[in-house]
Structures are given as structure tokens and as C-alpha cells.
Amino acid sequence: MKLSTSLLAIVAVASTFIGNALSATTVPGCFAECIDKAAVAVNCAAGDIDCLQASSQFATIVSECVATSDCTALSPGSASDADSINKTFNILSGLGFIDEADAFSAADVPEERDLTGLGRVLPVEKRQNCPTRRGLCVTSGLTACRNHCRSCHRGDVGCVRCSNAQCTGFLGTTCTCINPCPRC
């Protein structure tokens, strides 16, 4: 059975409910360990994308591991974290869930989001649109994601009402600003 987008979405769902609580576990190290454990469980090498895609259990095992290991925070700076980040992104890009160029780019990717329904009240031109940042949650953690969103709101139109942020997408790798800030 081919590894489908809906099956892999299970992993994404588990990683998006990270809330405000942070643990000492490193995100890339934790995710990489879960990927390794799941690969062994389905008799695949962690880098064998074709084998992982063919497995019907890989995403379920990774999802359960992410949930039970509390893969929600980053302790940045160690060489093993850098190796784990590379390994995790290689797996995710190999499975087609992230574009390697986007993941390793520092450039913002503009994306209009209306998660609060302000579009019904205020026209788009009256709202500030903050770009998502791919890979930021893994490389720098939820705190950096929140800082990115606050900086976006303050820098674009001088708005001081800080928006919240969350790590979304597959394995929570994308920083998404929520609660769009009306122009001040």
C-alpha cells in the first residue's frame, strides 16, 4: 500500500498540537529518532524513501512516537541537532512534503491566511498578511516562530498588537502567524 497524504497527515496532526508547553526534547533529534524507530519497525532503512512510502504503518508509528516522546521543543546549538535537522528534512523532502529549497531558505514565503474570519469584517487590504516561514519551527523552535510573527506585525505597519503563532504543516516544520492584525 502506498503511503498516502491522508495517512501521513496523522503525523502532522500530532505535531500541530504542541501548544505553549515546551519540553527539553529537541525537535529535530526527537523527530529523527522517531523516523529511525519507525523505519526499523517496518524493515526499511531511514533513508530508503521508496520503502517508507510503500509501508502502510510508517506514518502511524512515527505519529505515535512523536506523541509519546513529546517532540515539541528545541535545544539549539549542538552538532547532533544539525545532523538531525538535515536527516529529518531529507526524509520529509524525499517523501514530498517539503521543498528542500524552501526548507533551507531564510526567505519568507508570502501566504495569505484568514484564520479568524476577519475577511468578512475587514477587506484584505485593511489586514496585515504575515508570511509563513518554512523550517523555522524545527531549526529555531516555537519561541522564534512567535518572535517572527510579532516582528512581522510591528515592522509592516507599526501594529503593536502581537499576533500568536503556531507550528503547522507536516511534523510542525512551518511557522504560521495566526490572528491577523488589523491595520492600526
From Swiss-Prot:
Q: Propeptide positions, renumbered to this chain?
A: 24-127
For this entry, the protein name equals Fungal defensin copsin
Keyword Cell membrane in annotation: no
Name of a matching Pfam family: Defensin_5
What is the recorded phenotype of mutating T173H?
A: No change in activity against S.aureus, but increase in activity against B.subtilis
Effect noted on mutating T168G: No change in activity against S.aureus, but increase in activity against B.subtilis
In the record, which positions carry Pyrrolidone carboxylic acid?
Q128
InterPro entries in the record, alphabetically? Copsin
Report any one BP term from Gene Ontology: defense response to bacterium
Q: According to its UniProt record, where is this protein mainly located?
A: secreted
What does the free-text pH dependence field read? Optimum pH is 1-8.
Temperature remarks: Optimum temperature is 4-90 degrees Celsius.
**Entry function:** Antimicrobial peptide that acts against Gram-positive bacteria (Listeria spp., Enterococcus spp., B.subtilis, B.anthracis, P.aeruginosa). Is not active against Gram-negative bacteria. It selectively inhibits peptidoglycan biosynthesis through complex formation with the cell wall precursor lipid II (1:1 molar ratio), probably anchoring lipid II to the membrane, thus inhibiting cell wall synthesis. The interaction with lipid II involves the third position of the pentapeptide.
Q: Where is the signal peptide?
A: 1-23
Subcellular localization is given as: Secreted; Target cell membrane
Q: Which domain of life is it from?
A: Eukaryota
Alphabetic keyword roster: Antibiotic, Antimicrobial, Cleavage on pair of basic residues, Defensin, Disulfide bond, Lipid-binding, Membrane, Pyrrolidone carboxylic acid, Secreted, Signal, Target cell membrane, Target membrane
Query: What family does the database annotate?
Result: Belongs to the invertebrate defensin family.
Which cysteines are cross-linked by disulfides? C130-C159, C137-C167, C145-C175, C149-C177, C152-C184, C162-C181
Origin species, per record, is: Coprinopsis cinerea
Annotated GO molecular function terms are: lipid binding
Describe the processing and modification events after translation.
Answer: Contains a unique connectivity of 6 cysteine bonds in contrast to most other CS-alpha-beta defensins which are linked by 3 or 4 disulfide bonds. Disulfide bonds are essential for structural integrity and antibacterial activity, since activity is lost after treatment with reducing agents. Thanks to disulfide bonds and N-terminal pyroglutamate, the protein is extremely stable in a wide pH and temperature range and insensitive toward proteases.
**How is this protein annotated for GO cellular component?**
extracellular region; membrane; other organism cell membrane
